[in-house]
């Protein structure tokens, strides 16, 4: 900046006359510096934060400090300008000739001294920087040794000490330089010389001293303070950073020791009361009260303070325990408004919210006033209530509470709502009245009275009524004149035009006579010409007039030639051509005209060749299709062609699907249906069809309902009816009497009723058998019932003896006796109570009751005994935990030989499971070349033989190779990344893509991507250079744009070029 300032002084010394403008001199440099520092304060800070969270404080401080660099540089410029301005103002006030003398005499000396000072400062700073770097290396070594020795015994951070030392080393040199910098500046200021400017040559007398040291200090003061702040903050943060891992390691180790010796609740730090509150909120206060007491006592706070946190809360709005949330003033106000609380409670509890009763009352009145305000505002907006009345309603009711308050509020809202609805109806009537004004069928006097009444009911201001009356007047005038003009136009269209009468009418209704009369005259002329055209159109269509006569007459009337030609063509020529074409088409379709004759007649009419060719092609197709269809129909009628083949032939000719279906239906389907019906009658005589099948088959053939019904009845009575009778007989044999009313009486008496009686008798006998089994009937009663059915007595007695049940189970009794001896079951105390009498009530024979009771009691006792015998899982747990009691073994009923064998097996199994669990871990160890012979011997001992162990080792070797290939083998993605750093990327990518069989099109895409990615940095630098050249006006926009176009082959798109150019244009306007 000193060199730039010197150059500007040499170019134009006139700036000394207006030194205040020098403040803009640094604008460009400061702007560039701001852009740089903005990047530093955003992207660079984000980068620092992403690298390591431990220096967050440093990064934050650096970001804030660096962001102040623009202000710092402006301060430097301002200080320099202040010194220079004071000096110049002193000299310029004496004589203007000083400028010329200063330019000739001093500039050279200033340049010389500045050059010497600059070289000296740079050399001095380099010397001090080297000294600082030496000290930094020494300090870095000391810190590294200290950390390594001190952290060797820290088990949690010992492995990270070397990384910690490497992380701290880069920060030592900046801190050392920052420490030396203030001394460097002071020493430089003392060393730099002081010169004097003698003013005698210009006749002023005296000397002006210039102290370079002071100038250096003026420039360096801000930067030294700034760097001191950075150094201090950096050193403080690094000290905390170094200290924190050791403190944390010590706390973790101490915490583990305290937990192991039972002092886990002894805290190292007291939690804040906010955290205590959240902790208590998710737990029960009574549950954690004792622990809370110990924690609070650790704080050392006085008893009046801590006792409040330990006191049980009061079930009131003021709980007297700070951990419990008291009621808020707004909740109290709301409760008072709803009547839940009295207004006196509000004043009482307001004091607890540090609010005086008077203030609380004011807050209540304010909130009540807002509630009432919302209600009365509805009335004001609808002109239902005046502002004065609305204000009085609010003020007079602000002290109401509870029911009185809300009854008042709801009453106001209800009244306003009712009046609002009424006014909506009135406004609707008023709007309709406004839209209907001006209609000649209305009684204006009656309507005016109605409007006046509506305005009175609505209470609108007089100004609204005035505007409304004006709109009514204008509406009347416009509607009346529109109706009148429309009627005059309708009359004129009929050819009636009385000019005098029309003028009088227009004048009487305040029309613009000239314009209105011109409109009506135009309407008359249009009607006359339209009627003339209709006459000529009729004559042309009827061939009553020649085109020449029409053309002559219409030209005389002033019609344009184009309109005349269109009229003649549309109404005569077109009709004549259509008539001729219709006759030619009719004769050609019948084959009465040859192709040459058709062409001759088309040529005479003037038909174009395209239509002629299309017409002849159409006629040929029609004649061909017509002949083909005649032959095809005959073949279908005679069944000489399959309908599918016929359908295919029709499709070849592009015959419409509906027409094809019609031909096949009429010529084939109807005839084949007749033949099918004949065949069906023959089949029905020998094969069985039910009614539904018969109906279905007949419906396929017969579409007439009468014929269909006759055929169905015929087949029904011949084949289906006998089956129906058999069906009802089968149902009766199973006790089902369906609807047989339609069957003849003979069939019912001799076939259905006997079958039903047989079923009923069989069912009653089965019922008696089941009743005997369930003891629901006595044996004597069962015999009597069987005899009533007509059964002989000896057979009835046999049935009864057979079906009386035996309730006890001999096999179960025998099993209970044997198992009782085996399990050594003692007597199980069972109280049978009145079970014997209850069984007797059920009808169980006395001979079975005692046996039955003994059977169930012994079974019950054995079930209890079995349920509690030691199972195999209990024996396994006993082996696992070395508790094999003799009684446990005895009651398990496992033979001793088997038990000893199982104990040995299970113990071996437990050890083997643990040994084999090392298998996957040992494979991982083998991958990293670690072999343990002791573990291999154990594996061999517990199920892993030599062959399987060899397989495990082979698996580890293969896994190691796969792991290496996964890390180092070139996949397409890795090849794309590595291609940026190899000498022949194209060859590398080609080899990898070929190996993975990547499609050629995709290969070309990624070749281009790899190339553009490799050169993208240089492309960005070129774009930046083009940007700088354009901003410095070294190249014009066209040249810059041509350079950008050359970069399109490296991936730059037209959209990106347009955005870059737009950015240049925006920056040029900045």
Curated annotation (Swiss-Prot):
Effect of residue 303 to E: In strain: Isolate variant XX
Effect of residue 937 to S: In strain: Isolate variant XX
Record note on what altering residue 557 to I does: In strain: Isolate variant XX
Effect noted on mutating residue 729 to L: In strain: Isolate variant XX
Effect noted on mutating residue 702 to V: In strain: Isolate variant XX
Effect the entry attributes to changing residue 498 to D: In strain: Isolate variant XX
Residues in UBA domain copies: 477-523
Phenotype upon changing residue 1032 to R: In strain: Isolate variant XX
PROSITE patterns: UBA
Name under which the protein is recorded: Uncharacterized protein 1070
Species of the source: Sulfolobus islandicus rod-shaped virus 1 (SIRV-1)
């Amino acid at each position: 900046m000193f060199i730039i300032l010197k150059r500007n002084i040499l170019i134009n010394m006139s700036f000394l006359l207006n030194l205040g403008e020098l403040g803009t001199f640094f604008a460009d440099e400061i702007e560039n510096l701001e852009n740089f520092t903005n990047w530093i304060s955003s992207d660079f800070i984000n980068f620092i934060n992403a690298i390591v969270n431990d220096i967050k404080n440093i990064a934050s401080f650096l970001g804030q400090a660096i962001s102040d660099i623009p202000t710092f540089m402006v301060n430097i410029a301002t200080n320099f300008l202040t010194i220079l301005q004071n000096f110049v103002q002193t000299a310029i006030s004496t004589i203007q000739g000083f400028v010329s003398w200063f330019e000739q005499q001093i500039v050279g000396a200033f340049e010389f001294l500045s050059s010497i000072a600059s070289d000296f400062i740079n050399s001095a700073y380099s010397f001090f920087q080297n000294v600082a770097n030496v000290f930094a290396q020494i300090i870095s070594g000391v810190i590294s040794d200290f950390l390594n020795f001190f952290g060797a015994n820290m088990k949690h951070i010992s492995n990270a000490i070397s990384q910690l030392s490497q992380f701290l080393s880069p920060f030592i040199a900046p801190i050392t330089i920052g420490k030396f910098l203030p001394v460097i500046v002071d020493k430089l200021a003392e060393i730099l010389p002081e010169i004097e400017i003698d003013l005698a040559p210009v006749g002023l007398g005296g000397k002006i001293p210039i102290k370079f040291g002071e100038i250096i200090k003026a420039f360096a003061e801000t930067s030294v303070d700034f760097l001191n702040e950075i150094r201090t903050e950096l050193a403080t943060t690094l000290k905390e950073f170094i200290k924190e891992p050791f403190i944390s390691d010590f706390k973790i180790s101490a915490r583990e020791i305290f937990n192991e010796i039972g002092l886990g609740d002894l805290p190292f730090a007291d939690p804040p009361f906010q955290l205590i509150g959240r902790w208590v909120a998710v737990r029960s206060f009574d549950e954690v009260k004792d622990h809370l007491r110990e924690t609070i006592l650790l704080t050392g706070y006085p008893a009046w303070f801590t006792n409040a946190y330990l006191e049980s809360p009061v079930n009131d709005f003021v709980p007297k325990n700070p951990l419990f949330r008291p009621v808020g003033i707004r909740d109290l106000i709301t409760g008072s408004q709803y009547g839940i609380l009295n207004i006196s409670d509000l004043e009482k509890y307001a004091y607890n919210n540090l609010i005086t009763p008077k203030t609380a009352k004011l807050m209540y009145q304010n909130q009540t006033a807002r509630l009432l305000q919302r209600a009365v505002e509805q009335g004001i907006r609808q002109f239902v209530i005046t502002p004065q009345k609305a204000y009085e309603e609010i003020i007079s009711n602000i002290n109401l509470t509870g029911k009185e308050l809300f009854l008042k509020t709801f009453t106001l809202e209800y009244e306003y709502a009712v009046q609002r609805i009424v006014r909506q109806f009135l406004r609707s009537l008023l709007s309709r009245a406004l839209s209907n004004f001006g209609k000649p069928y209305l009684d204006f006097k009656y309507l005016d009275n109605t409007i006046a009444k509506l305005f009175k009911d609505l209470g609108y201001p007089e100004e609204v009524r005035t505007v409304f009356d004006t709109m009514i007047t204008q509406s009347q005038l416009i509607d009346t004149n529109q109706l009148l003009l429309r009627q005059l136009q309708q009359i004129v269209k009929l050819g009636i035009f009385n000019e005098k009468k029309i003028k009088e009418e227009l004048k009487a209704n305040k029309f613009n006579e000239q314009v209105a009369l011109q409109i009506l005259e135009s309407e008359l002329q249009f009607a006359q010409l339209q009627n003339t055209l209709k006459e000529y159109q009729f004559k042309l269509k009827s061939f009553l007039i020649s085109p020449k006569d029409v053309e002559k007459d219409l030209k005389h009337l002033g019609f344009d030639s184009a309109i005349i030609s269109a009229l003649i063509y549309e109404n005569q020529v077109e009709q004549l051509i259509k008539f001729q074409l219709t006759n030619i088409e009719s004769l050609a379709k019948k084959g009465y005209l040859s192709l040459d004759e058709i062409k001759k007649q088309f040529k005479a009419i003037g038909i174009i060749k395209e239509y002629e060719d299309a017409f002849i092609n159409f006629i040929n197709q029609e004649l061909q299709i017509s002949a083909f269809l005649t032959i095809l129909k005959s073949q279908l009628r005679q069944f000489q062609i399959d309908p599918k083949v016929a359908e295919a032939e029709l499709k070849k000719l592009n015959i419409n699907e509906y027409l094809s279906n019609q031909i096949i239906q009429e010529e084939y389907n109807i005839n084949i249906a007749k033949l099918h019906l004949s065949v069906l009658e023959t089949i029905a005589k020998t094969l069985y069809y039910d009614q539904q099948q018969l109906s279905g088959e007949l419906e396929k053939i017969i579409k007439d309902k009468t014929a269909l019904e006759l055929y169905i009845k015929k087949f029904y009575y011949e084949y289906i009816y006998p089956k129906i009778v058999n069906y009802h007989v089968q149902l009766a044999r199973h006790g089902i009497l369906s609807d047989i009313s339609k069957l003849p009486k003979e069939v019912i008496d001799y076939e259905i009723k006997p079958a039903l009686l047989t079923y009923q008798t069989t069912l009653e006998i089965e019922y008696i058998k089941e009743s005997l089994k369930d003891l629901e009937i006595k044996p004597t009663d069962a015999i009597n019932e069987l005899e009533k059915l007509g059964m002989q007595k000896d057979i009835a007695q046999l049935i009864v003896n057979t079906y009386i049940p035996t309730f006890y189970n001999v096999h179960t009794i025998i099993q209970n006796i044997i198992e009782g001896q085996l399990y050594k079951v003692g007597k199980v105390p069972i109280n049978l109570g009145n079970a014997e009498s209850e069984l007797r009530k059920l009808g169980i024979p006395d001979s079975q009751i005692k046996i039955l009771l003994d059977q169930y009691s012994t079974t019950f006792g054995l079930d209890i005994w079995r349920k509690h015998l030691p199972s195999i899982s209990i024996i396994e747990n006993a082996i696992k935990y070395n508790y094999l009691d003799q009684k446990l073994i005895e009651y398990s009923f496992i033979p001793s030989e088997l038990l000893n064998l199982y104990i040995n097996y299970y113990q071996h199994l437990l050890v083997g499971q643990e040994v084999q669990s090392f298998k996957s871990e040992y494979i991982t160890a083998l991958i990293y070349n670690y072999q343990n012979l002791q573990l291999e011997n154990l594996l061999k001992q517990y199920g892993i033989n030599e062959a399987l162990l060899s397989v495990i080792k082979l698996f580890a070797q293969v896994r190691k190779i796969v792991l290496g290939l996964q890390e180092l083998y070139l996949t397409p993605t890795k090849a794309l990344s590595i291609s940026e750093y190899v000498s022949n990327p194209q060859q590398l990518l080609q080899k990898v893509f070929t190996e993975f069989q990547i499609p050629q099109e995709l290969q070309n895409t990624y070749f281009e991507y790899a190339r553009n990615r490799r050169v993208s940095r240089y492309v960005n630098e070129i774009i930046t250079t083009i940007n700088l050249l354009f901003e410095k006006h070294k190249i014009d926009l066209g040249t810059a744009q041509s350079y950008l176009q050359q970069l399109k082959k490296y991936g730059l798109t037209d959209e990106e070029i347009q955005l870059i150019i737009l950015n240049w244009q925006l920056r040029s306007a900045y």
